[in-house]
Amino acid sequence: MFESIIVDRAKTTFLGELKSYNFSIYAQWLGILSIFLCIILGIVNLFHVTLVVLFSALTIIEGVLLIFIELPFLSRICPVSDKFQAFTNAFASNYYRGLVYFIFSVVTFLSCIFMATSLIATGIVLALTGLCYTFAGIKGQAFTSSSTLGGTGITTETPPSTMV
């Protein structure tokens, strides 16, 4: 019984966030996908004999950095230095997050100079995430973390009732 309530709440929360047209939420979910792709495809591409190995290692490092940028509660759980905490907190605005994702995307795409690998998929998702954060900044949407991931989520304001 409780499982179905939890699953139903997660579905409605997740679907509600997707229907919100908030690009910051879209970007956060694409950011989570980027983390998985960076780490998994970075490890997979470590076994090349070209300089793609260097870009694979950089992609893994990008994935680890993105974990702390996208999931800030982990910096409270994991012991990190105050400087690293301040570094990850610097990316609180949509524009800075978009810039970071675009830089990571360019670095990942540079691996194509040596060999076309599956890191292209990582670069595409990183670029899409950067676009979503940039669109959120252009539209004036404040950074909003998904309630499914432990954030505040989308707040829907109810209009004040009018008295007759």
Swiss-Prot record:
Disulfide bonds: none annotated. One of its GO terms (biological process) is endocytosis. The chain crosses the membrane at residues 35-55, 57-77, 100-120, 123-143. It is found in: Golgi apparatus membrane. It is a multi-pass membrane protein. GO terms for cellular component: Golgi apparatus; Golgi membrane. Keywords: Glycoprotein, Golgi apparatus, Membrane, Transmembrane, Transmembrane helix. Glycans are attached at N22. Belongs to the TVP18 family. Golgi membrane protein involved in vesicular trafficking. PANTHER family: CALCIUM CHANNEL FLOWER HOMOLOG. This is Golgi apparatus membrane protein tvp18.
